Design a protein with these regions (language model features):
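Nucleic-acid endonuclease domains
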Residues: 1-73, 78, 87-219
């Protein structure tokens, strides 16, 4: 039976429209922390906050997260098809990394397509004194293993995003046609044990208009 992707969008969209269109980093992180959400300590909080918000607000219409895994790879939700939720700051360029390549291919084979909900917007960044990073580190209470490893390598600390103003939310139908036309392979390097990580799918947001079935425009 063919999937009516627009019908699924019509179920999800009224809920997504209730989401705040401006995210203050401190408020979002504290909200996740107070509600014992996982990954509130992560520096790339915009992605984790969107996943957290969807988990809390879409759970009545979706299975959250999707219980089936492809190998070890999960999808964020399930409503007739697997779904993933992604956040993207326009300052990061036009390309976005999505899920594991083989997991996406297998899910498309099982269901015909995978749904992506992509939040796109402009981020504001921490100042040179890194006050936001300092505040976030204080919330964590102790230095994370990631931070210890960074210092050991002598690597500079990346500037944190302090807020995000959402300009649009796109509902993308990722099927074989879209994957073949617009998907490329993103190699992630190696795991801590030296083994190569599985490649992911990289999409150019400027090219996927004909795969985008629905857009919430906040510009």
């Amino acid at each position: 039976m063919a999937i009516d992707f627009k019908e699924l969008c019509n179920i999800i969209c009224p809920i997504i429209k209730k989401m705040p269109m401006h995210w203050d980093g401190k408020k979002c992180i504290l909200e996740m922390k107070q509600n014992k959400a996982r990954n509130w300590k992560q520096m790339e909080w915009i992605g984790w906050y969107f996943e957290y918000w969807c988990n809390r607000n879409l759970k009545d219409v979706m299975e959250m997260p999707y219980s089936k895994k492809y190998g070890k790879v999960p999808f964020d939700g399930y409503l007739k098809i697997p779904w993933d939720f992604k956040s993207h700051a326009i300052q990061s360029g036009d390309k976005i990394i999505v899920n594991d390549l083989q997991a996406i291919k297998k899910a498309i084979n099982d269901f015909g397509c995978v749904g992506l909900i992509i939040v796109n917007g402009s981020a504001a960044y921490d100042n040179e004194l890194q006050y936001f990073k300092e505040w976030h580190d204080e919330q964590k209470g102790k230095e994370t293993s990631y931070e210890k490893q960074r210092k050991k390598r002598g690597a500079p600390s990346r500037r944190r995003k302090v807020s995000m103003k959402i300009s649009k939310i796109s509902f993308v139908k990722l099927d074989n046609d879209c994957l073949d036309k617009y998907g490329s392979i993103y190699n992630q390097g190696r795991n801590a044990n030296g083994k190569p990580r599985e490649p992911k799918v990289l999409l150019d947001l400027t090219e996927i208009c004909d795969c985008t079935e629905y857009v919430i425009d906040n510009e």
